[in-house]
């Protein structure tokens, strides 16, 4: 008998061949089959540079589900988009083209962004195709395209008309490095070293009081001092005024419950603005406003300057860090610096630039969030979260929100606000008709207005304001409005964007459709570097997928990605890649063995299965199909793979292939026994290939097409059916007893340092009242290489069900 397979699996040849084949037959094309939809809201990767293996990690997770659902018979809508507008793309362009957006013409810079974006989109596409990600590329989109710009601007106008969007001068988070407003979600805390300085203030009455602060440079912006009303040390100061040292401004002393009695001196400055608590006090107590930080991150004290040689004159125009140093030096010279203590503390920084943020007053666009927190929590609880623990993250985020979503950005490459500001009397904001969209107000005029009568809004929208409409993108690109694409079946994403992408999408779906955006959300963890830190190109610990694909092939990379618990961070592991490589080799070799017999039964006939051990392996297979199906149905791909792989190695390869060889070859067995073996081999391998196909699409397709010649393994309705006729509990127990005896025989031979092929003259089985079927005995003789099996049915006084002894032929 001859195998249909070469000695070694050549993954590079196979992947190239199958990618062309799948593309030719449009395997992943969405067919719009009514009633069988499975719609995936796909995360559009940001065009910010090369993808590393950490990005590949989560994109594979989504693909496992897409392939499984397709094999279940679902019509899977699996689009791919690219998030190529906004600051990340700008930064990439500035780095590659060695330009600064602020230094060149806006149109010229946007053209460079489009050029670079197109190049990286193509690179991403090639990588995703190399990984076997089963996107429908006919549904590709990118967020700076005219179609998406139109949708985003339509969303803005709809929300504006609903009264859910407003423009206002109010405190916002400001990134001085990128010179733009940012949203609360783009702020992260970093531990930094600083100084806690205790400074001597005085009241108008001349009483000395001490303030502890990490930001002495904000003293010119001090508008009040606060103490806790329960703090008896300062109750007598209520209603008095304090003099800010070296600057001389007079500020009220007030009480508020938010002051921590045991922090610092218990008496704190309120400046406009040092932090969010300052904003809270400013609003609550209707305090004055004294803004001294410019948008470039320098001190702006021109209104405080009387003479150029004053301290204010020296501070004007210098950086925040330098100003802090100068103020402390001056306080020290004036004997007003009581104490200066080095500390480590958390500082709010911009997520993108990594620089400390400031809170400034600025006119920005906002989407209302705070007033509908309760409604948003209700929406969150209508969605199935996998894992369930991830829901708590977004609930805590919503509970803690006290700022609306700032959606305007002072950048260049983004979607413009479709807004002009009228200079005519009694007019403020001009909004175009939706039929005119997309528009750039800096390049066009509203109908009936001259350029002297309007001022264009030059800001662009927060990238999330567009990508949070991703469920709606599906409707645009399918051209289908007759079926509901919201809620989608699944959103798949990683955990660090729960507060941004997940939250904003829930918000947009609620406002626009009064619906949840998806029925289920599957949340992946991070792929961590060897030192358990997040992979990052800037840290130099990110692995490039193309190198690993060349070395291991796509199936091994996908296997590695599948070996991560849903929602859990996973350390990148060469060991897991080696396990994947070993699995590919073993699957190829096992299939090579089975291929010698499959020609007899290309379509396996289970009516031919008569032998006990064949029924045993079919029962084990049935239970694996049930468990894998149940796991996939709740998006636990890792658990499904664990069940499948355990069955493949332990039950199929280690035991069944060994015990069935003699019958498969037809050596000294009846035709019935032979047919039972080859039909079982063929059926079990086919089911294994199908269950492994979502994880390892290339090798499973290659083996399946070679052996069974029955279309693609990834076709609809190709997932193994849960067939109860496969299950026979009695035969399963007989099989388990068989394996127990076999393992004891193997152990005896190993202890005697004999080959597993060493011939046994007599295999003696001590058991209590046990009758073995003839087919069972024949298989046991074959696999143990035993000439005779003798049963000793005396009453057993051993703990084990069987006591095995052997007499070797020699």
Swiss-Prot record:
Keywords: Aminoacyl-tRNA synthetase, ATP-binding, Cytoplasm, Ligase, Nucleotide-binding, Protein biosynthesis. Disulfide bonds: none annotated. PROSITE patterns: AA_TRNA_LIGASE_I. GO terms for cellular component: cytosol. Its EC number is 6.1.1.9. It is found in: Cytoplasm. It catalyses: tRNA(Val) + L-valine + ATP = L-valyl-tRNA(Val) + AMP + diphosphate. One of its GO terms (molecular function) is aminoacyl-tRNA deacylase activity. Pfam families: Anticodon_1, tRNA-synt_1. Its main location: cytoplasm. ATP binds at residue 537. A motif ('KMSKS' region) lies at residues 534-538. CDD domains: Anticodon_Ia_Val (cd07962). A motif ('HIGH' region) lies at residues 45-55. One of its GO terms (biological process) is valyl-tRNA aminoacylation. It comes from the Bacteria. Belongs to the class-I aminoacyl-tRNA synthetase family. ValS type 2 subfamily. Monomer. Catalyzes the attachment of valine to tRNA(Val). As ValRS can inadvertently accommodate and process structurally similar amino acids such as threonine, to avoid such errors, it has a 'posttransfer' editing activity that hydrolyzes mischarged Thr-tRNA(Val) in a tRNA-dependent manner. ValRS has two distinct active sites: one for aminoacylation and one for editing. The misactivated threonine is translocated from the active site to the editing site. This is Valine--tRNA ligase. It comes from Ehrlichia ruminantium (strain Welgevonden).
């Amino acid at each position: 008998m001859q195998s249909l397979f070469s000695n070694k699996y050549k993954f590079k040849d196979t992947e190239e061949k199958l990618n062309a084949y799948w593309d030719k037959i449009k395997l992943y094309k969405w067919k719009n089959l009514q009633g069988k939809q499975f719609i995936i809201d796909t995360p559009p990767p940001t065009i910010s540079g090369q993808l590393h293996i950490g990005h590949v990690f989560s994109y594979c997770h989504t693909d496992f589900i897409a392939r499984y659902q397709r094999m279940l018979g679902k019509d899977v809508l699996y689009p791919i988009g690219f998030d190529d507008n906004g600051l990340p793309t700008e930064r990439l362009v500035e780095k590659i083209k060695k330009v600064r957006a602020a230094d060149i013409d806006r149109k010229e810079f946007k053209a460079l962004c489009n050029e670079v974006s197109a190049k990286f989109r193509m690179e991403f596409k090639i990588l995703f195709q190399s990984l076997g990600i089963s996107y429908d590329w006919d549904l590709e989109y990118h967020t700076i395209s005219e179609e998406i710009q139109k949708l985003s601007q339509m969303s803005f106008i709809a929300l504006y008309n609903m009264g859910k969007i407003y423009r206002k001068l109010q405190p916002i988070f400001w990134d001085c490095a990128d010179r733009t407003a940012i949203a609360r979600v783009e702020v992260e805390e970093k531990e930094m070293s600083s100084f806690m300085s205790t400074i001597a203030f005085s009241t108008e009455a001349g009483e000395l009081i001490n303030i502890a602060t990490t930001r002495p440079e904000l003293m010119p912006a001090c508008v009040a001092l606060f103490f806790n009303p329960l703090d008896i040390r300062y109750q007598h100061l209520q209603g008095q005024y304090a003099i800010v040292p070296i600057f001389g401004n007079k500020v009220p002393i007030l009480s508020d419950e938010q002051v921590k009695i045991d922090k610092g001196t218990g008496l704190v400055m309120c400046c406009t603005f040092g932090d969010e608590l300052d904003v809270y006090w400013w609003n609550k107590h209707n305090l004055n406003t004294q803004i001294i930080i410019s948008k470039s991150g320098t001190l702006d004290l021109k209104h405080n300057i009387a003479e150029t040689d004053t301290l204010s004159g020296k501070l004007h125009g210098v950086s925040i860090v330098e100003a802090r140093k100068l103020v402390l030096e001056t306080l020290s010279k004036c004997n007003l610096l009581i104490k200066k203590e080095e500390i480590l503390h958390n500082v709010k920084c911009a997520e993108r630039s990594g620089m400390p943020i400031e809170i400034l007053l600025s006119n920005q666009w906002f989407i209302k969030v705070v007033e509908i927190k309760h409604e948003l929590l209700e929406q969150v609880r209508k969605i199935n979260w996998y894992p369930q623990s991830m829901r708590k993250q977004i609930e805590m985020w919503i509970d803690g929100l006290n700022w609306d979503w700032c959606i305007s950005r002072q950048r260049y490459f983004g979607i413009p606000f479709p807004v002009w500001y009228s200079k005519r009397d009694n007019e403020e904001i001009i909004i175009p008709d939706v039929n005119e969209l997309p528009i750039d107000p800096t390049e066009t005029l509203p109908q009936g207005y001259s350029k002297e009568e309007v001022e264009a809004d030059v800001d662009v929208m927060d990238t999330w304001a567009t990508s949070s409409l991703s469920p709606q993108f599906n409707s645009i690109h399918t051209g289908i409005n007759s079926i509901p694409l919201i809620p989608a079946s699944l959103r798949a994403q990683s955990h660090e964007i729960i507060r941004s992408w997940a939250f904003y999408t829930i918000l947009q779906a609620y406002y626009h459709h009064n619906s949840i955006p998806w029925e289920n959300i599957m949340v992946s963890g991070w792929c961590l570097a060897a030192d358990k830190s997040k992979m990052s190109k800037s840290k130099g610990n990110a692995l490039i997928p193309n190198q690993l694909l060349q070395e291991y092939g796509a199936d091994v990379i996908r296997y590695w990605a599948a070996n991560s618990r849903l929602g859990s961070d996973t350390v990148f592991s060469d060991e897991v890649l080696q396990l994947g490589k070993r699995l590919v080799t073993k699957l190829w070799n096992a299939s090579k063995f089975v291929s010698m017999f499959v020609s007899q039964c290309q379509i396996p006939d289970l009516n031919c299965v008569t032998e006990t051990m064949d029924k045993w392996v079919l029962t084990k297979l049935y239970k694996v199909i049930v468990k894998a199906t149940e796991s996939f149905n709740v998006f636990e791909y890792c658990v499904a793979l664990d069940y499948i792989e355990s069955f493949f190695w332990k039950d199929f390869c280690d035991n069944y292939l060994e015990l069935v060889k003699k019958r498969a070859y037809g050596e000294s067995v009846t035709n019935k026994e032979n047919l039972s073996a080859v039909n079982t081999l063929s059926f079990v391998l086919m089911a294994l290939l199908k269950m492994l196909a979502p994880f390892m699409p290339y090798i499973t397709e290659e083996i399946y097409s070679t052996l069974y010649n029955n279309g693609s393994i990834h076709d609809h309705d190709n997932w193994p059916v849960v067939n109860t006729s496969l299950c026979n509990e009695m035969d399963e127990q007989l099989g388990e007893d068989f394996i127990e005896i076999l393992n004891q025989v193997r152990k005896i031979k190993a202890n005697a340092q004999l080959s597993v092929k060493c011939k046994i003259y007599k295999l003696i089985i001590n058991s209590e009242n046990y009758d073995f079927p003839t087919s069972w005995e024949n298989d046991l003789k074959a696999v143990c290489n035993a000439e005779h099996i003798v049963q000793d049915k005396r009453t057993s006084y051993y703990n084990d069900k069987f006591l095995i002894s052997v007499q070797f032929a020699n």
